[in-house]
Amino acid sequence: MTESERGQLPNDSSPPKEHERRRVSKLQGLAAFSPDALASIGYADQEIYLGLVVAGSVGLSLAFPIALSITILLTLLALSYYQICQSFPSGGGSYTVARANLGTVPGLVAAAALIVDYLLNVSVSLTTGVDAIASAFPALWPYEVELSLLLLAGITILNLRGMRETGIVMAIPVYLFLLAYLPMLGYGVVRLSIQGPVSLASTAPLAIQPLTTYLVLRTFSTGCTAVTGIEAISNGVPSFRPPSTKNAGQTMIIMSLLMGTLFLGTIGLTQILGVVAGPQETILSALARHLVGTGPVYFAIQAVTLIMLTIGANTSFVGLPRLLSVMAEDRFLPKPMTKLNSRGVFSNGIILLALAAGVLIIGFSGSSHALIPLFAVGVFLAYTLSQTGMVRYFNRERGRRWTAKALLNAVGAIATGITFVIVGYSKFAGGAWIALLLIPLLVLLFLQVHSRRQEADVALHASTASP
């Protein structure tokens, strides 16, 4: 059983016809699986801005080149995960792919990295969402922690109750988000063509640090959070209507194009228009205010951004309990993680995620900027392991055009592996060490639980076999 086979729908015991009825179209699938990926511009743009603004106009002039390099990485990942969609019709998450092709320990490392990723996605998304709305209503800034915890409590309760008709619930905010940002970007391009670019030298603050290679690497590493969430569709291939692999693959490409457009568009306009954020404002808020003014449209954009980031956080409440249940089925976690409550959800996993995310929000004072260094480490470790597993898969299966497919995943694995090293090095002191320490500790925990459960099985078998 894979990460996506269990828990795709509210209750795994529902009849086959019900499963078929709940399969999603490409438009529904885009809404269901893309929120955290599309909403990642909320924190990726901000981290690139914060990383470069300390070097003044010279630093900010590198925003678009850095975003372009990250978009190239996004393209490699999109093509790689497109292949995973085609090769694993039952769902191909990092844990599944790595364990099946690289072995148990690499699979557990991927699982540990995913757990860290899911946890940080909740904390970062909710705190970034609060930043978005506080940019519109500055009086809310002192209440970042409280508001983040309030949002966390809300989505926890909704998930414990079981959100059965998630398609429509997800689709409305996702498409509102696209309807808010894509026209705004289009208007920005038109305005740029009429008024021309604005020199950053006239708007950027004075540099307080020199522009160094280390600063650029550090900014690149935090900006790479823009590619988080791209794996979600490969996890959910069975949820798509037949032909599921084709529909999932096409949805992956559409999502990646939207991610690239939003990311490059917002970063590009910010740089070319010379947009600079105030001390209590996100860079996306500053861009929206610059383009549409401080009126109803601006406030609507900020509200939609908050909602989108909250839904992005909710994807972890679907993915992590499912992953924990699969690992418990594989005997690497306690059996209670497989239990569904009366509403057909993995309540133990949901509660565990909510508690851990709450601790992080409180421990880091509701600061998404402080949480980001922990985030990217697990993401790129999981990406590297899954793509390395795909190279092994194609080398073993040797199907049609297997050499080209293996080469693509190899290039992707090398790219994400290098990015993992850059993130670990440049953000180690900033908090990446916590994730780098937590991942092996989780692997040791999984192995310990597996050993204990095997011992218990042996003891139970011996007691039942004795006369």
Residue ranges and their predicted role:
Residues 155, 160-190, 252-255, 372-385, ...:
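Membrane-interface loop-to-helix entry segments
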Residues 30, 203, 336-347, 383-428:
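C-terminal membrane-solvent junction of multi-pass transporters and transport-like membrane proteins
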Residues 177-203, 267-273, 384-399, 448-457:
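Hydrophobic alpha-helical segments and their helix-loop junctions in multi-pass secondary transporters
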Residues 104, 142-149, 239-262, 325-362, ...:
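Loop-to-transmembrane helix boundary motifs in multi-pass membrane proteins
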Residues 1-52, 79, 90, 98-100, ...:
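Membrane-interface "cap" regions at the ends of multi-pass membrane proteins
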Residues 175, 180-228, 426, 430:
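Helix-loop-helix junctions that connect adjacent transmembrane segments
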Residues 103, 254-312, 337-365:
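TM-loop-TM module centered on a large, flexible mid-protein loop between adjacent transmembrane helices
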Residues 49-99, 105-113, 124-151, 256-260, ...:
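Extracellular loop-to-transmembrane helix junctions
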